Amino acid sequence: MSAINHLCLKLILASFAIINTITALTNDGTGHLEFLLQHEEEMYYATTLDIGTPSQSLTVLFDTGSADFWVMDSSNPFCLPNSNTSSYSNATYNGEEVKPSIDCRSMSTYNEHRSSTYQYLENGRFYITYADGTFADGSWGTETVSINGIDIPNIQFGVAKYATTPVSGVLGIGFPRRESVKGYEGAPNEYYPNFPQILKSEKIIDVVAYSLFLNSPDSGTGSIVFGAIDESKFSGDLFTFPMVNEYPTIVDAPATLAMTIQGLGAQNKSSCEHETFTTTKYPVLLDSGTSLLNAPKVIADKMASFVNASYSEEEGIYILDCPVSVGDVEYNFDFGDLQISVPLSSLILSPETEGSYCGFAVQPTNDSMVLGDVFLSSAYVVFDLDNYKISLAQANWNASEVSKKLVNIQTDGSISGAKIATAEPWSTNEPFTVTSDIYSSTGCKSRPFLQSSTASSLIAETNVQSRNCSTKMPGTRSTTVLSKPTQNSAMHQSTGAVTQTSNETKLELSSTMANSGSVSLPTSNSIDKEFEHSKSQTTSDPSVAEHSTFNQTFVHETKYRPTHKTVITETVTKYSTVLINVCKPTY
C-alpha cells in the first residue's frame, strides 16, 4: 500500500449534500422553506425526511445536480441480511442469482405496504444506472412527505426494489429535464413535477429558486432556503448572473446549473506572489453533490503547481508533502463582477496517519469544470430555475441564527439588493489563455503568464482520464454520478437520457419548456433532439473509450460538449456513493 493510501480515509465521496435537519416552514404564507444541512464526517451533507402514513424516517442524499427523488425498498435483495431489510434466499435479478453485497445496517429503507398514502404509478419502470456499474431499479409511485409537521402530498418518487447503490436514497432538486425517465426499457418517457416544482404548485414557495450556504468546512452545519435568501449568510455584494446553456445545439434552454467563469488564479497574500492561470471564459457547473473540484488538466496542473503538488498516476490524485503550511494562500475564482476566494485549507486532503502525503482536492478532467463543495463552502449561491439565473457572493462564515434575515425571491427572479452582473457570458469554447492579470490591482509581483494554447494542443493536454483517489473507481465523484453517487470529483453533468453503444451515442433531451399550471415543465409532446456521435469524433482517451461501450441510460452520467470541433465524451458518476480511498479535507 502506498503512502497516500495510509493517509487516506475510506469515505463516501458522494457529497450529495444531504439534508440532516429541517427547520420550521413559515406557516404564514411568506413563501419560503428552510432546511438545515448537517455536514457528516466532514465530507457530505445528509437529511432525514418523514415519508408515508404513518411516517417512515429515511435519510437521503440531497443533490442540486440531479432531479429525481428515490428511496431504497426494504426488500432489496442486494442488502446483506440485517434488521433494515427483508431476507431473501435464491433471489434473482435479470435471470441471475443475486449475491448480497451491500451493508445496509446504517441505511434506512422504505416499505410501501406500511403506508396508507402510497400510490403505485403504472407509468413505467424506474431505473438509474451509474458509471461505476451500480444501479437502482424499481417502480414509480407517489407519497406524502412530511416536513416539520407540514404534509406535502403527491410527491412522485422511485422505489428501488433492486439496488446496488450504497445509499438509502436521493433527493434531487435540479431541472426536471434531468430526470431519469428516458433511455431504458420500460421508461415512462415523460417528465414530471419534482420536489421543488411541487413546493411551488402547493404554494409553499412562489418561485422555483433556492439559496445554498454550506458554511465553513469545520462548522458542521449549513442551510438551504427554498424561495428566499438569507442576507446574513454572505458578505459584500450579491451579483446575479445568467445561467449558460452548455448544449445549445441540443436544447434551447439551460439544463444544468452552470454559469460563466471569467478567470482563475491563486495568490500568497503574505509574500505578495500570485499567478493568473486563465482569463478565458468557460462554463462551470456548481454542484453540491460534488465533493472536490474538477478542472481541465491544463488548469488543474497550474492550480496544483502553485503549491508544489504533483500528479500521482498510481493514486489518481495530486499529492504534496505533509504537513502543509496553508498560510495566506488562497485561490480566486473570477466571475467578472466579483471574485470568490477559497482558502488553501479547503483544498488540502489530510493523511490518516503521520508521515504520509497530503492530497490536493482538484481533479483533472477532459474538458469540464465542476465547482463542488470545496468551492461552494466559500460561496453563497442562489439558484433560480424558473428564470435561469445564478446569484453569487462571498460566504459569511461568521453568520449566526440571531442575525438571520430572510428575503423572498420575486417571481421574476429579482432579489432585493442584488446587482445585475455585467460580465459577458460564455458562448463557445476557446483555447485557454491569459490576456490579463486578475491581480493587477494588488501591485504584487506575478508569476509568468500561462502561454496561449492552440486548439489542438489544448485538446491533447486536456484529454486525460478523470480519476478518484482510487484508480480502480470508474466513476468520478466529485460528481456523484452514482458515484455521487458518482460523486467523487466528478462532473455530474447531464442533459438528458443517454444510451450509448460502441458505434453510436444518442442523447435525448427536451428542447422546450412549457408551463403546466404553476409548475414549469417540458411538454409531454415536446420534440427531443438527437445528437449523433460517430467514432471519428470521439476522443482517444482510453477511459472514455471504455465507457463508450458501456450501456448508460441515465442522463447524469455522460456529458457532451463540442470542444474545438471535437466532441469529448466524459463519463460522470452521479449518485453512486462509493467507498474509496480518498483523503479527508484538512481545515
Swiss-Prot record:
Residues 1-24 form the signal peptide. Residues 45-393 form the Peptidase A1 domain. It is an enzyme of class 3 (hydrolase). Its EC number is 3.4.23.35. Transmembrane segments: none annotated. One of its GO terms (biological process) is fungal-type cell wall organization. The active site is at 63, 287. Glycans are attached at residues 84, 90, 268, 308, 366, 398, 468, 503, 551. It is found in: Secreted. This is Barrierpepsin. The gene is BAR1.
